[in-house]
């Protein structure tokens, strides 16, 4: 049995949700209603996020990237946490509903690209189009967009110990099949509603300390 860590990006690895930051800065007011319909689960994540990005003109590409480079911050302890999982041969994957044009640059030099799973964007038309290269498998009918539970099934064995780290509704389906969940923000609410055991966290130091204990117990 091996330990597999599946970690969200927006609002988890980074302090802020980068998609929401983009919408607040660059989208028209109607983005707020779409966001609320996603959080209430009235819209599927795939449809809601597609609608959000269709509100953003593609000519803002360079401006958006520059904005995120200047404002996005990695959560406290993340660098040390990555060093810890590497030293202990723990498999680590980023499974993100975020977009390639900002996830890859913000993680460059920290996480190999082959360990990052995110959505793809097309800037060839007037407005941004989101492509979905990691859809739901036949076990999931939630129209996740990037289906985290499907990726967990694809990347690991059922005998592995699955750890999910996340912060929002987009992490709920993955949390349902995890052996251990580290949660913050809205994911705490959803875990409580669905009777999913979780450990709250604010920094990656919190998670690293818990993992140290887990390794001691399993050794």
From Swiss-Prot:
Which GO terms of the molecular function aspect are on file? 2-hydroxy-3-keto-5-methylthiopentenyl-1-phosphate phosphatase activity
In the record, biological process GO terms are: L-methionine salvage from methylthioadenosine
Which InterPro entries is this protein grouped with? HAD-like_hydrolase_phosphatase, HAD-like_sf, HAD-SF_hydro_IB_MtnX, HAD_hydro_PyrdxlP_Pase-like, HAD_sf
Q: Quick one: which pathway?
A: Amino-acid biosynthesis; L-methionine biosynthesis via salvage pathway; L-methionine from S-methyl-5-thio-alpha-D-ribose 1-phosphate: step 4/6
User: Out of the domains of life, which is the source?
Assistant: Bacteria
Family, per the entry?
A: Belongs to the HAD-like hydrolase superfamily. MtnX family.
Function description:
Dephosphorylates 2-hydroxy-3-keto-5-methylthiopentenyl-1-phosphate (HK-MTPenyl-1-P) yielding 1,2-dihydroxy-3-keto-5-methylthiopentene (DHK-MTPene).
* Protein's UniProt name: 2-hydroxy-3-keto-5-methylthiopentenyl-1-phosphate phosphatase
Per the UniProt record, the source organism is Bacillus cereus (strain G9842)
